[in-house]
């Protein structure tokens, strides 16, 4: 049974004596910039659900005074913590709304929000007001954001970059003990999920379907550099999509020819496109002339996964656990 990270980490008791204290001023390299913290922040605004959930997982919910950019419900176990924190916006907050909370740090998931072309604000704008910013390394390392938008990933995502974010945020807030314990817990959970299905011997393959602009349009499928590719690789599963794009559109005829052992379908709370609805995804797969003949569909090997687990965040581990459990309960690895 999974429990809220903070329940394990924040109550870690005697573990604190083993971790070093942060010495201020602390200077870190973040997304190509030197960022200096004069002291542990007491007021944080997090512009991004992943960043928010990491702060909560480090037991820092009482330091978060505002959040924004939500894709779905908060990580299970943090409902009460999150209910006490002001939500500045479900999507993009304004620069002024962030400043109104008098933050001592602004964290962000994406440079699209806080970066050289940030639509919320540029790091320099905040720093001129004495507010340091910290953007998730997973949006900078092995990724080119110079073209704006979602950017282009240039190297495969690895969980180590999330562990770097956890470790650095723990250092910034002087809670290194919690950071060390959280990273250790996540690594142990990934190892346990791998063990659950043992060796797949390279015999399994998958296609990960995020959504489609129209239900009969080419689907957005996970390429080989994003978080879903890491989930598959962690379990020894081949990704049939070879594109270096993070979410390329690929025709169903092409996917059918690659004959994946399974289809992993994203569950989204948003309803931007009809295919965001997981029920609509299943109806399409079972009714379309091409997809209904795919062995993955006819054999019942279409597995649901929370879309948040497909983001470059600590929820990737939950995605690995979910898929491992689905495979273990099926006849795929027998």
Regions found by a protein language model. Give the residues of each.
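Bacterial N-terminal signal peptides
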Residues: 2-14
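Solvent-exposed loop/turn segments at secondary-structure junctions
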Residues: 50-53, 70-73, 105-106, 111-116, ...
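Extracytoplasmic ligand-binding site segments that recognize negatively charged/polar headgroups
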Residues: 73, 113-121, 131-168, 201-227
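Short helix-initiation/N-cap motifs at beta->coil->alpha
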Residues: 28-32, 86-96, 139, 244-251
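Structured C-terminal subdomain patch of bacterial secreted/periplasmic proteins
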Residues: 156-165, 264-334
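A short, structured surface patch at a secondary-structure boundary
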Residues: 43-116
């Amino acid at each position: 049974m999974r429990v809220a990270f903070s329940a394990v980490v924040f109550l870690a008791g005697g573990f604190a004596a083993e971790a070093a204290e942060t010495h201020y001023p602390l200077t870190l390299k973040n997304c190509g910039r030197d960022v200096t913290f004069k002291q542990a922040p007491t007021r944080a605004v997090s512009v991004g659900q992943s960043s928010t959930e990491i702060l909560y997982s480090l037991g820092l919910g009482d330091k978060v005074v505002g959040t924004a950019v939500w894709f779905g419900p908060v990580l299970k176990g943090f409902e009460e913590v999150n209910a006490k924190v002001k939500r500045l916006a479900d999507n993009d907050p304004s620069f002024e709304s962030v400043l109104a909370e008098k933050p001592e740090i602004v964290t962000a998931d994406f440079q699209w929000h806080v970066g050289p072309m940030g639509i919320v604000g540029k790091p320099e704008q905040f720093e001129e007001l004495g507010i340091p910013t910290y953007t998730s390394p997973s949006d900078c390392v092995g990724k080119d954001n110079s073209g704006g938008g979602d950017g282009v990933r240039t190297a495969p995502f690895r969980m180590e970059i999330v562990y770097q974010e956890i470790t650095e945020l723990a250092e910034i807030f002087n809670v290194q003990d919690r950071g060390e314990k959280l990273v250790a817990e996540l690594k142990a959970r990934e190892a346990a999920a791998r063990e659950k299905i043992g060796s797949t011997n390279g015999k399994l393959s998958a296609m990960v379907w995020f959504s489609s602009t129209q239900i009969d349009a080419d689907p957005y499928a996970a390429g080989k550099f994003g978080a879903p590719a890491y989930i598959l690789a962690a379990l020894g599963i081949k990704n049939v999509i070879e594109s270096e794009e993070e979410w390329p559109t690929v025709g169903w005829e092409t996917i059918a020819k690659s004959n994946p052992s399974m289809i992993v379908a994203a569950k989204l709370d948003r309803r931007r496109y009809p295919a965001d609805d997981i029920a609509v995804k299943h109806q399409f797969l079972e009714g379309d002339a091409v997809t209904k003949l795919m062995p993955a569909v006819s054999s019942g090997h279409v597995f649901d996964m929370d879309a948040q687990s497909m983001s470059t965040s600590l929820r990737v581990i939950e995605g690995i656990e979910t898929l491992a459990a689905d495979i273990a309960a099926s006849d795929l690895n027998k």
